[in-house]
């Protein structure tokens, strides 16, 4: 599967016009959000792990799109397109990064394209599921790639292993551990070296 992700990445830029047309044809509604680092991620505990705040949904389209997010949803009310209007040096006003989510029964393929006119692909990721639970993430970038495997107790993610090759051709071999409080909410995320990445406020590992 990682080879499939790498293959899709290599042809992604050339496929961009067709991918964009195909996914946007499925959009039935658009909405906007502001602040934070977006509204959602397919990656488990993305906001907690990175200490990001979430964006807030806007009631109507903003007059100024700088640092705003635009979302396209399909007829199942699933997000399938994300546009991120970052205000950064070198980015022309109105340009945006964009993600496409091609959703299938037990798999989602995401494409992440940059803001440039060339629309270079930043990464391609394949998310696989079983009984509604994420099983693997296969990620391909320009010079590196990795595969992540999820382990559960019941429906609670307890371990996430990452193996691959970094952009210096060195091996990647790491894992994250997840703990939960008595109410079932995430309590902590710890790296393979024991470093506490996330700790719920008021709790101790």
Residue ranges, per PLM feature:
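Buried hydrophobic residues that stabilize the cores of well-folded domains
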Residues: 1-205
């Amino acid at each position: 599967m990682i080879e499939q992700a790498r293959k899709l990445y290599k042809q992604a830029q050339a496929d961009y016009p067709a991918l964009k047309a195909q996914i946007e044809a499925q959009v039935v509604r658009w909405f906007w959000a502001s602040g934070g680092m977006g509204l959602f991620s397919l990656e488990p505990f993305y906001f907690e792990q990175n200490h990001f705040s979430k964006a807030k949904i806007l009631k109507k389209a903003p007059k100024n799109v700088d640092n705003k997010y635009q979302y396209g949803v399909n007829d199942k009310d699933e997000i399938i397109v994300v546009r991120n209007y970052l205000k950064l040096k070198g980015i022309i006003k109105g340009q945006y990064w964009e993600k496409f989510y091609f959703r299938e029964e037990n798999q989602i393929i995401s494409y992440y394209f940059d803001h440039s006119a060339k629309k270079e692909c930043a990464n391609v990721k394949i998310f696989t599921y079983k009984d509604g639970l994420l099983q693997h993430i296969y990620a391909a970038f320009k010079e590196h790639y990795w595969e992540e495997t999820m382990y559960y107790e019941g429906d609670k993610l307890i371990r996430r292993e990452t193996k691959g090759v970094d952009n210096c051709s060195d091996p990647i071999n790491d894992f994250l551990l997840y703990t939960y409080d008595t109410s079932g909410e995430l309590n902590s995320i710890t790296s393979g070296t024991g470093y506490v990445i996330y700790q719920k406020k008021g709790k101790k590992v």
